[in-house]
């Protein structure tokens, strides 16, 4: 299906007409990732029969690597930027794509894709965790809903303590812009769901305390949560219908997500399963939202029961079915073993910084690898010592319409890396010099791209296949 409805190679749209033409034009990078994860799960279950998903997998992986890491829309379809839930799906999908390539004997493609996934994983906290939280006493460091970044900004501010988030659907006259560091949701739980972070991780647990303090709704059926603070998509405060503005209510879907986390943490998830069942309508349908205030019998609105929101919400039903299976089997069904093996079991990964046209990183850490990654063949004209020695390196091609050059940064490197491009197909110079400054670990700003606290290696294996730099004077 993903092959049939993706008008842009590798992109799976949210919805489409019966002839396959996309209806909504917005792109969510998590929805590019999901078909890859599904394909791998079906492959592992030996359920693909004669269908070969690899062309779709290659296209989707290429799209994620060319257009990420900022997503045009996150899972709530409202904002662009660095989203913990979107990044989690991308890391998982790219790991699955690497597994597909490895099984086909394409070791170089597998290494390249996996290294991009590692790059995303190593930047997760520096992109999406504030250190200036104000929502819960004594918890300053926690995940935020999204760090807003415009996808057409080639020099984004990647400090999650900065940025203003526009909240959609606010009532006329209401404040609509808030500090992004003060807006939270539970999307970071996807990191645990897929096997990228451990349940019980102190940062995850602290972030949950913040979420519970501002989003949790306790009902006779069990706990539920609103999407994010200041959400305005839902039944109005007076009980009237949503007509372009309103008040975000509790979403049963999020109860299912929390149930999966509690199971992963070794706790009883049954109460969350029963809560979901209690939120259903009399006909057994799960709503998008339920009424989370005192009963309004005159409007047929009852605490803990469906509002006038979409019913059934298939997303919520899918979450319920997966939670039911997970509870029955005693483990989270959505966890991908290959992802967990990569990120939960102490394996060393590469320390990689990536410069590309849509993310022209300003600085890299000494002792790591700087990858120059673009979408056309090139020769890189570069120096590590202010042009005392000049290097010209031909880019390495990949199977994903991506070309790259790796520069190993010595631990003692101090001078900035300066470079420009000679475009091979067009036989022309770029005409612009670019600079990446070098920062050392002792002074490296944690709000800029860096490695996470897990162990890291140094040079990526794939860099060994690139042509050697040629020194020119």
Label each residue range with its predicted role:
Residues 1-68, 84-87, 91-97, 313, ...:
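Aromatic-rich carbohydrate-recognition surfaces in CAZymes
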Residues 2-21, 85, 103, 110-253, ...:
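Extended ligand-binding clefts on enzyme/binding-domain cores
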Residues 10-25, 65-82, 165-173, 299-306:
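Acidic/His metal-coordination segments adjacent to aromatic residues that form catalytic metal sites
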Residues 14-17, 24-31, 35-38, 178-198, ...:
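C-terminal capping/lid segments that line or modulate ligand- or cofactor-binding pockets
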Residues 23-26, 51, 55, 77, ...:
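Short, solvent-exposed segments of well-ordered alpha helices
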Residues 42-58, 98-117, 195-209, 262-274, ...:
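Structural helix-adjacent loops and short alpha-helical linkers that scaffold large soluble proteins
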Residues 56-66, 89-103, 112-130, 210-213, ...:
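Alpha-helical scaffold segments in carbohydrate-active enzymes
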Residues 335-473:
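Glycan-association/targeting regions that enable binding to alpha-glucans and other polysaccharides
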């Amino acid at each position: 299906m993903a092959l049939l409805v993706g008008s842009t190679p590798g992109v799976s749209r949210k919805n489409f007409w019966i002839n396959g033409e996309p209806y909504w034009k917005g792109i969510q990078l998590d929805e590019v990732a999901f078909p890859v994860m599904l394909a791998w799960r079906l492959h592992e279950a030996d359920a693909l029969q004669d269908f070969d998903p690899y062309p779709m997998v290659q296209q989707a992986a290429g799209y994620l690597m060319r257009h990420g890491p900022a997503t045009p829309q996150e899972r709530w379809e409202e904002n662009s930027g660095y989203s913990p839930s979107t990044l989690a799906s991308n890391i998982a999908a790219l790991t699955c794509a690497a597994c597909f390539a490895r099984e086909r004997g394409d070791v170089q493609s597998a290494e390249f894709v996996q290294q991009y996934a590692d790059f995303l994983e190593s930047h997760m906290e520096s992109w999406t965790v504030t250190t200036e939280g104000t929502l819960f006493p004594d918890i300053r460091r926690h995940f935020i809903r999204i760090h807003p970044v415009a996808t057409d900004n080639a020099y984004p501010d990647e400090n999650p303590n900065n940025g203003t988030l526009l909240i959609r659907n606010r009532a006329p006259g209401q404040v609509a812009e808030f500090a992004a560091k003060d807006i939270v949701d539970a999307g970071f739980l996807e990191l645990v769901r897929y096997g990228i972070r451990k349940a019980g991780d102190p940062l995850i647990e602290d972030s949950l305390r913040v979420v519970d303090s501002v989003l949790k709704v306790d009902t006779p059926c069990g706990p539920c949560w609103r999407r994010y603070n200041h959400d305005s998509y839902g039944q109005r405060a007076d009980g009237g219908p949503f007509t372009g503005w309103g008040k975000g209510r509790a979403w049963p879907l999020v109860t299912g997500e929390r149930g999966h986390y509690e199971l992963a943490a070794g706790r009883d998830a049954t109460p969350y399963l029963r809560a979901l069942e209690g939120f259903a309508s009399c006909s057994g349908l799960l709503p998008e939202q339920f009424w989370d205030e005192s009963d309004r019998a005159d409007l047929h609105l009852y605490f803990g029961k469906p509002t006038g929101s979409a019913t059934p919400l298939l997303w919520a039903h899918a979450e319920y079915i997966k939670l039911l299976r997970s509870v029955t089997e005693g483990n989270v069904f959505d966890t991908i073993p290959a992802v967990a093996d990569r990120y939960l079991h102490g394996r060393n990964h590469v320390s990689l910084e990536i410069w590309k046209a849509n993310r022209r990183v300003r600085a890299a850490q000494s002792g790591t690898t700087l990858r120059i990654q673009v979408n056309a063949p090139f020769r890189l004209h570069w120096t590590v010592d202010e042009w005392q020695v000049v290097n010209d390196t031909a880019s390495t091609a990949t199977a994903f319409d991506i070309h790259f050059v790796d520069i190993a940064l010595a631990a003692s490197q101090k001078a900035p890396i300066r470079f420009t491009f000679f475009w091979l197909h067009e036989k022309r110079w770029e005409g612009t010099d670019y600079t990446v400054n070098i920062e050392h670990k002792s002074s490296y700003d944690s709000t800029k791209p860096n490695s996470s606290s897990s162990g890291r290696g140094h040079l990526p294996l794939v860099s060994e296949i690139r042509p050697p730099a040629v020194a020119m004077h």
